[in-house]
Amino acid sequence: MTNMRKTHPLMKIINHSFIDLPAPSNISSWWNFGSLLGMCLMLQIITGLFLAMHYTSDTMTAFSSVTHICRDVNYGWLIRYLHANGASMFFICLFLHVGRGMYYGSYMFMETWNIGIILLFAVMATAFMGYVLPWGQMSFWGATVITNLLSAIPYIGTTLVEWIWGGFSVDKATLTRFFAFHFILPFIITALVIVHLLFLHETGSNNPTGLNSDADKIPFHPYYTIKDILGILLMIMFLMTLVLFFPDLLGDPDNYTPANPLNTPPHIKPEWYFLFAYAILRSIPNKLGGVLALILSILILALLPLLHTSQQRSMIFRPITQTLYWILVANLFILTWIGGQPVEHPFIIIGQLASISYFSIILIMMPISGIIEDKMLKWNS
């Protein structure tokens, strides 16, 4: 068996990726989220496949087909809520994974990091299109509002929006193509994940100290396989608690009303995991400016390797940058809260201040703090 593991063309790849992979001996639980994300992706593809067997992408029957899944299909309610809340778990793990990368300087692996950003955009696009499929009020109006943002693009904007809609409004053509894209994107994401891992295994994993760990490596199996299994069990416990006790906790009640183009919901808002970006979008009075800020709120991650001014990779020994990092985390919570509030005083000004803080911490304060910390180290020596 050992020979086959190391000689068989397919087994050899698996062996080098998950069994005999040299891993740093000191990576903490923050390094568990990669495997949890893989688990989430598998769960979403499997539950999604079973949902697609019963779903119809037609404006007349989409809402009814989701109701039929929940009421008449064996364990349909479980599959549907696993899929809906699985998306929330996916984003929780994604945000923690990206946060880990920012804290420990993993963005210095530029190829891995950039593929990660592409993955983040792909997952966000998939989740957005998935939210449209049940064809409830928030599905319809969310699709209308978000796709309409593209009309802010000069000259080609309006044509582009009508091309995406497949008509002059969000209708049957839009729903059908969103279903098609929502089905195909997870497989594209899976391919990107393989590329992400390929680039990661070229350099090896980072570790909490940010120092080179070549002198102190341990095999991935059994040390990190058992650690990943523990993480997966904890995630399943959390997800099942959510699904079985509070399935609608993270959803919107408006989505239990069938889509009606003649009746606008009082507060149009996306799912919770987009609220921070939605708050940044709304905080700018200009339409094109808002759209650019929305895209930049994620794309700013690509600038992190260029904005890294410190001699140290990780934030573990950098108290000023650490403080700024946790202020940034708190700021993202504030943005998420603001994104779910109506556009009125005092939420408008809070959103604007939080948006300015978000960009200034990343673009200005963190690079300056890196330089200051380096100077402080020189003074002490």
Swiss-Prot record:
Residues that span the membrane, as ranges: 33-53, 77-98, 113-133, 178-198, 226-246, 288-308, 320-340, 347-367
Molecular-function GO term, any one: ubiquinol-cytochrome-c reductase activity
SUPFAM superfamilies recorded: a domain/subunit of cytochrome bc1 complex (Ubiquinol-cytochrome c reductase), Transmembrane di-heme cytochromes
PROSITE patterns listed in its UniProt record: CYTB_CTER, CYTB_NTER
Residues reported to bind heme b b562: H83, H182
Residues where a ubiquinone binds: H201
Record: residues binding heme b b566: H97, H196
Keywords of the record: Electron transport, Heme, Iron, Membrane, Metal-binding, Mitochondrion, Mitochondrion inner membrane, Respiratory chain, Transmembrane, Transmembrane helix, Transport, Ubiquinone
GO BP: any one term: mitochondrial electron transport, ubiquinol to cytochrome c
Membrane topology of the entry: Multi-pass membrane protein
Cofactor(s) required, per the database record: heme b
Cofactor descriptive note: Binds 2 heme b groups non-covalently.
Subcellular location field: Mitochondrion inner membrane
GO cellular component terms listed in the entry, alphabetical order: mitochondrial inner membrane; respiratory chain complex III
Main location: mitochondrion
A Pfam family: Cytochrome_B
Role played: Component of the ubiquinol-cytochrome c reductase complex (complex III or cytochrome b-c1 complex) that is part of the mitochondrial respiratory chain. The b-c1 complex mediates electron transfer from ubiquinol to cytochrome c. Contributes to the generation of a proton gradient across the mitochondrial membrane that is then used for ATP synthesis.
Oligomeric form and interacting partners: The cytochrome bc1 complex contains 11 subunits: 3 respiratory subunits (MT-CYB, CYC1 and UQCRFS1), 2 core proteins (UQCRC1 and UQCRC2) and 6 low-molecular weight proteins (UQCRH/QCR6, UQCRB/QCR7, UQCRQ/QCR8, UQCR10/QCR9, UQCR11/QCR10 and a cleavage product of UQCRFS1). This cytochrome bc1 complex then forms a dimer.
Note: Heme 1 (or BL or b562) is low-potential and absorbs at about 562 nm, and heme 2 (or BH or b566) is high-potential and absorbs at about 566 nm.
Stated family: Belongs to the cytochrome b family.
Protein name: Cytochrome b
